[in-house]
Amino acid sequence: MLSPLLRRYTWNSTWLYNARIFIALVGTTALPWWLGDAKLTIPLTLGVVAAALTDLDDRLTGRLRNLVITLFSFFIASASVELLFPWPWLFALGLTVSTISFILLGGLGQRYATIAFGALLIAIYTMLGVSLYAHWYQQPLLLIAGAVWYNLLTLTGHLIFPIRPLQDNLARSYEQLAHYLELKSRLFDPDLDDENQAPLYELALANGQLVATLNQTKASLLTRLRGDRGQRSTRRTLHYYFVAQDIHERASSSHIQYQALRDHFRYSDVMFRFQRLLSMQSLACQALSRAILLRTPYQHDARFERAFTHLDAALDRVRASGAAPEQMKALGFLLNNLRAIDAQLATIESEQVQSQAKSETENLLADDSIHGFDDIRSRLSRNMSPESALFRHAVRMSLVLCAGYAFIQLTGLQHGYWILLTSLFVCQPNYNATRHRLALRIIGTLVGVALGLPILWLVPSLEGQLMLIVITGVLFFAFRNVQYAHATMFITLLVLLCFNLLGEGFEVALPRVIDTLIGCGIAWIAVSFIWPDWKFRNLPRVLERAVNANCRYLDAILEQYHQGRDNRLAYRIARRDAHNRDAELASVVSNMSTEPNVTAEMRETAFRLLCLNHTLTSYISALGAHREKLTTPEILALLDDAVCYVDDALHHLPSDEDRVSQALNGLSARINHLEPRQDSKEPLVLQQIGLMISLLPEICRLQKQVLS
């Protein structure tokens, strides 16, 4: 058994990743030093950097396939640069065609998008060192050697820790779930201003992050499930993922209007007790995340039982004081929902629960990977027009790199290819992301050069500079996903140190700054004027997709109220799509906040629509969380009509507005006249239908403003 301290570092993926980078860079600096040819350090180190930036999680056979594709792409890109470099016009043509081709390959999936970026990166690295070697094949082979060395270390790590990346993704899913539950608990703050929509907005953004993490976990699971479904570790991981999905559905559900809840129970301890329960469940998800990372059993907190007992007693006191029956029913449903989350967490380690027989469709995951040549052709054809954001980015990126290359040819800059390198890293598919990276890139470069010059003077020895190359390289990878400005500073130091091996460290400092400014300027001009991807223009289309996904989610829930509860694949796909589209809408609205052409009125409308759509999804999620077979014909008929009317209201033409309004009013009247069985889920169904209907008038009004 490992001690807790040793286990903490042995199973710490960040530490293991940094250790792998350290070993790789030690190899690329120690070998040239031993051979007495310090110049070899440059292509070997850059090969390691490119390989590390294109590292992809997969099972062993998938990693080997990725390695072959990556090395082939790297060699083609690097050799093409060497062979075409003497002929500027052919080089410009090759740069344009290869940039568009590589980026469009990203339409086949994340694997190909990552490899394509690496190929473009290795091409620019080749440009930086094109004068280092006499023969065209020398630098490409050395870059490939660096990439092979890093991938050998990666494969070794995979053999030792084969499912570690999957466990990391699972742990992140529960960590994001904990964050979502904590934000959800703030809605139960009795002192919250009724006009303040910020907590709901933060909740919608957190939901987007959680959905993205769950999708990443699903992709990681899929790579390991093929032919491996019967293993105990696979069943366990799949069980954890399904529990996370179920908790997400329950956590995102809403059983009551929070403003009404605060108005009725502002001076009662009920609000605080619900808030505390959600906070405790958030802490439980954090503890589960740590248990997954450290591979230790999760211990459920025994205080939950006491918290539920005291909340029951508080609700009994409120009920005895004469609170409205409708409010008490809603709180009862909310309490049952929290009990279900608690039951999931309490039994997640149970072998009996994990081994329960499920139908084949309940264990399936939706596979979005490529299936055959027809699928490849279909995916590529979808991105062959200006309607595709990927196509626009491919054309924009090719023009950016060609503009940088033309500037180099016209001015004769000796180290001008850093312009292309800067543009490649800074130019993102949308304005907001580019603007953010642009500022951080400039700051990081300026600080890196300011620190680098005295370091070159203070550490003149070869051995000292090789050690600093290793240290700055490790720090670059340690910071690249958490603080881009710091990462840029360290990669700038690494570049200065590498070129100082050629005696050019002081010479390249000022060009590095100038080239960074030029590259950032070209990238900014491109995203601002070449098919600018303003998110406010996408709002109508994204809103329509979110509305459609909610309607399909409702359809899937309706089917289960007729046929009985299960977790079949079709239901989970509908649920995932609804949350994906809600996350997409949150991303668009968030990006709109910094775009220059958005009016304050449009920004406010988009913000309100995001809050309303997330609330609608939460009301639908509550129906899904409590789904079970109903037998009362009147309730089922009402539910059928409600689903149809909601769909009709969200898709109607302006000329049909009166008809839709009358239908919804009639539905509200039918809800008031029905008497559901109190010992079933019928009261909850009626309650959730009423909550959904209450949102539709404002959603339709704002929807009309956006579409007009």
Question: What kind of feature is each model-predicted range?
Answer:
Residues 95-99, 242-250, 616:
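Elongated alpha-helical scaffolds
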Residues 1-120, 125-162, 332-490, 498-517, ...:
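Alpha-helical transmembrane segments and their membrane-interface boundaries
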Residues 1-19, 30, 34, 55-56, ...:
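Long, hydrophobic alpha-helical segments that serve as membrane-spanning/inserting helices
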